[in-house]
Structure formats: C-alpha cells, structure tokens
UniProtKB/Swiss-Prot annotation:
It is an enzyme of class 6 (ligase). Belongs to the class-I aminoacyl-tRNA synthetase family. One of its GO terms (molecular function) is arginine-tRNA ligase activity. One of its GO terms (biological process) is arginyl-tRNA aminoacylation. A motif ('HIGH' region) lies at residues 129-139. This is Arginine--tRNA ligase. Its main location: cytoplasm.
Length: 562
C-alpha cells in the first residue's frame, strides 16, 4: 500500500509541475511515506510538501493543500488531511485492507517477498568459530542472526550464499593439538606437563579417547581416522580439527543452520591467496619495511594506525589472511559481502577494509558490511549460567537447545537488535504461556488451524472463494485492525533487509499475534451465516499465512497443534 500512495503522490507532484505550481526543472524529492505512531494521524503520512516548499517558494501548508488537490482520486483512500507544518495524512478505505488480505491468500508463501535484490549475489559469513571446541551460546547468537539475515535477504530478492570461515591455521590449533596430545598421554589440566594455554574442557578428553580408539570422522565426504600414535602431532591435529568441526556441524544442523561454503584459512596459504594479497598490497605502493617487518600504511585508508603484515620472524599477522579471505570473496563475484561478528572483533573492521582499499582492485568503500552482536547472558532460576571455554565451565549451544528447544532458542537469540546485550531466560523460554513470545506467536498460528478443524468437525465446509468474495463484510474495527497489521508485513521484510536486523520480523510477529488473539477473542467465527463465516475464516487464514511466512524467516516452526 505504501507503493500505491507513493505513486499517487508522484502523480500529484507531476500535476503541480504541469500547472506551474512547481518549477518544471525541480528534482523529485526523496519523500517518505510512513505509518504514523498513532492511527489518529491516519494510516500513512508523507513529508513531500515540506520537501517541495522551497522549490515552489511556498508555505509548506499551502503547498500541501495544492498537492492534496492535485492527487488523483483513488477508491483505496477515504480521506486526506493536512497536519502540523505541512504533513499530509492518508486514511485508507476498508476496501484497501480487504484487498490486501485477499492478496495474502492468493500469493501465499510469496506474500511479503520482493525483488529489490534482483537476484544479485551476497555473501553472508557467520559463526566462523575456531574448530577448537563445542559452540557456545555466543556462537549460537551469531548462527541465529546470520542465518536469519540470509533468509531475509533471500526474501528481498538477493541470492544469499552462506559461508563459514574456519580459522584452522593459527596458534589456537597448535594449543588444541597439544591439549589433545597431553590427554592422550594421561596428563590432566593442572598436572605437570599440561601445555600453557591448553584447552581444559572435558571434550578434549573425548577427542583423545576417540583418537586412541581409532575412531573415524566423516567430515563432508572425507574420512579422518584416529592414528592411535601419541607422538604424531600432524595426525593428532588433523583428527582433533575434524572431530570438533564435525561436532560443530552436528550442533548447527540441530539448530537448523546450514552453509553453502566451508572455507578453510589453511587453503589461503595452500592456494597462494595470502601471497597474492601481499603482492597486490606491495604493488600498490602502500607498504613499507621497518624494524625487519613489513607494514601496511593503513592510516591512508581510515585506520587508526599502520598495521604489521609480516613480522620480523617471517610469519604473517592475523590481519593478512583476513584480507586475503575477503579478497577471495570479491574475486568469487560477491557484489555484497556481509560478515556477522561478535562486537569484540570491532577493532578488526577498519584494518580489513583498509587492506582491501589499499589493493586498488576496485573494491568499493564500506565493503564488506558488518553486523556485530553483543554478549549473551544465560539465566536459569534467577542466576547466571557462566560460560567459559578455557576454564572448562562450559554451557554450550547444544545444552541450550536441549533445555529450551530449537524454536525458543532461535527466537530468543534474535529477538533483540544484534548490537544490544541479550539476556536469555531459560525458564521463560520453556514456559507455555503468553509471557513467552515464541509460544504466543506459534499459538496464534495453531489457533487458526484449530478453527479450521473445529469447522470440519461441525460439518461446516470452508469455501475460500466465497470467503474472498465476502471480505467486504468485515468492516468492524477489530477486523480492520487485524487487516492493517497483516498489511505491514511486506514493509517489515523490506526494512529488515535494508537494516540487516531480523529482530524487526520477530517484533512484528508478536504484534500480529496480539492483533489476531484480540480479534479471535472478540469475534465469533463459526457463525451460522456461511458468507460471514467464510469471510472470517479467510481473514484468519491470511493471518496464519503471514505468521508462517514470518516464522520461516526466523527459522522457527509454525505448528498446527500445541
């Protein structure tokens, strides 16, 4: 409906140009059509007249009056008013909302989706956990946010490629290997011989036992077998990484998260991508030698200080493979690249972008885009559940899913803006009450399914065609409020895609569920009059469809029974 109003306003502006009220060469303003905070100010409002007033050399209210008079007539608009300094408020006719409800039924799963991305490719990288242990709840938030961002982008017409980057070539992998080797030798944490910086969780003992038992791990089609040799560090490293990568994959699968691409940091070295990145940076003239190290003059590109690329001992800093990895994304045709990271990685953003700009290979400024998430605090029984991988006090994503369930875990982890601190209340997530938002939303969907079953049990045949033809009967306030809420869904999908904020979908679904439950409690649905009954069931089915569409964007199920 916003598009309809934008079209009407644009036609009105053209009419003002034609009659000389506006200069013929004035540029069309980038006006806003939005829903007011309260419905007392109409269903939609625009600032178009205020933006045009200067070009027209007119008082904004006077120009607003002229624009209102120039608007084409539309049966979807019942009233237009001028408010404040020159806002124009639109009141929609019931027929507009009734037609929107019908569109939901006709479009089904596609309702709310758009083609703004035009099929272009966007790479979405998320989780990217080191393969050194099970996924913790922070990784879970990254997985939920990243997966939902990709789903929302798909709904906005983009071709989202989901990518997991494994840091399998750093110091952490060496510490992992030494930790497993110590366990293989029977050395426990805090005993003599335990490696400094070793991983202390009980899962290390699990890896060691599997390695010495000759267990096999099928990792994406490659079989890795425990060599049972306590001295073979290469074999231990290979098995430990494969074992823990597989464990992470199992957790992600249970969480409903999958990836198109698993990219290994080690492949950047093996395939010469790190060397290529260094060569491009040196060729661009933005590097220099100092103190036996190779530096990038990243301050030329907005970084707060220059960065070491190659240390005096000949090894590369983490910065170099990060830049090489993002260069590979550009070379693979990602018009957009989005990386979801914990907020503690904020310091790496400027240096990666600086490195990419310094290559001078055509990568635009602001590429890649970043979505940063804050920490998660998990509460149970009013007390915080501590998370500490290195100390071994380890509450994992798997633990959380087992306690709260997949749907509640996904919902709660994306329910707030990513850069907001998040408290996950396990007790609330397990409740089957209206206080639990995911239960409240899912129950609205199940309630419509129950209505249809009740109709069938009573021998009342639901005729969708008859319901569509009689939606005009539903002009009471509760029905129109529900239709109004339903009609917001395409705007929410678009806004979530632009802002990369899937929590907007969760917030909307809760508001839609509230509108539906309110309508349901105040509206007899299975009435004797078949036309009224079919119309009400059709409206209920429209609400159900939008609930299902939105829940799918969040990776949450839409149950038919609860």
């Amino acid at each position: 409906m916003k598009n309809l109003l934008r079209a009407l306003i644009s036609q009105g502006i053209e009419a003002l140009r034609a009659n000389g009220t506006l200069p013929a060469d004035s540029l069309p303003p980038d006006f806003v059509v939005e829903r007011p905070k309260t419905r007392d100010h109409g269903d939609f409002a625009t600032n178009a007249a205020m933006l045009l007033a200067k070009a027209a050399r007119s008082n904004p209210r006077a120009l607003a009056q002229a624009l209102v008079e120039a608007l084409p007539r539309s049966e979807d608009v019942s009233k237009v008013e001028i408010a404040g300094p020159g806002f124009i408020n639109f009141y929609l006719a019931p027929a507009a909302y009734q037609r929107e409800a019908a569109s939901v039924i006709k479009e089904g799963h596609d309702y709310g989706r758009n083609l703004s991305g035009n099929g272009r490719t966007v790479g979405v990288e998320y989780v990217s956990a080191n393969p050194t242990g099970p996924l913790h709840v922070g990784h879970g938030r990254a997985a939920a946010i990243g997966d939902c961002v990709a789903r929302v982008l798909d709904a906005n017409g983009w071709n989202a490629k989901r990518e997991f980057y494994y840091n399998d070539a750093g110091v952490q992998i060496e510490n992992l290997s030494l930790s497993v080797q110590a366990r293989v030798k029977g050395i426990a944490p805090d005993q003599d011989g335990w490696p400094e910086g070793g991983y202390r969780g009980e899962y290390i003992a699990d890896v060691a036992r599997a390695y010495m038992a000759g267990a096999s791990v099928d990792l994406e089609g490659t079989l890795v077998v425990g060599a049972k040799d306590a001295k073979d560090m290469q074999a231990i490293r290979r098995f430990a990484v494969a074992y823990l990568r597989n464990e992470q994959n199992l957790d992600l699968a249970a969480f409903g998260v999958d990836f198109d691409i698993y990219f290994l940091e080690s492949s950047l070295y093996a395939d010469g991508k790190v060397a290529e990145a260094v060569a491009k940076l040196q060729a661009s003239g933005h590097t220099y030698e100092e103190g036996g190290a190779l530096w990038l003059r990243s301050t030329d590109f907005g970084d707060d200080k220059d960065r070491v690329m190659r240390k005096s001992d000949g090894t590369f800093t983490y910065f170099v493979p990060d830049v090489a990895y993002h260069l590979s994304k550009w070379q693979r045709g990602y018009e957009r690249a989005i990386t979801e990271l914990g907020a503690d990685h904020h310091g790496s953003l400027a240096r990666v972008r600086a490195g990419l700009q310094a290559m001078e290979v055509g990568i635009p400024q602001g590429w890649p885009e970043y979505v940063l998430h804050q920490m998660v605090t998990v509460m149970r029984g009013g007390e915080e559940v501590k998370l500490s991988k290195r100390a071994g006090s380890y509450f994992t994503l798997r633990d959380l899913i087992e306690e709260a369930g997949r749907d509640a875990t996904r919902w709660f982890l994306i329910a707030r803006k990513p850069d907001s601190q998040l408290t996950f209340d396990i007790d609330l997530a397990r409740q089957q009450s209206n206080d639990n938002p995911v239960f409240y939303v899912q129950y609205a969907h199940a309630r419509v399914c129950s209505l249809l079953r009740q109709a069938q049990e009573k021998g009342l045949v639901y005729e969708q065609g008859n319901g569509l033809a009689n939606l005009g009967r539903l002009s009471d306030d509760a029905s129109l409020l529900l239709m109004n809420e339903i009609s917001r869904y395409p705007e929410v999908v678009e806004a979530a895609g632009v802002a990369l904020e899937p929590h907007l979908v969760a917030q909307y679904l809760r508001e839609l569920a509230h509108a539906f439950h309110t309508w349901y409690h105040g509206t007899p649905v299975l009435v004797d009059d078949s036309a009224d009954r079919n119309a009400k069931l059709t409206l209920a089915c429209a609400a159900r469809q939008v609930l299902a569409n939105g829940l799918e964007l969040l990776g949450v199920s839409a149950p038919e029974k609860m």
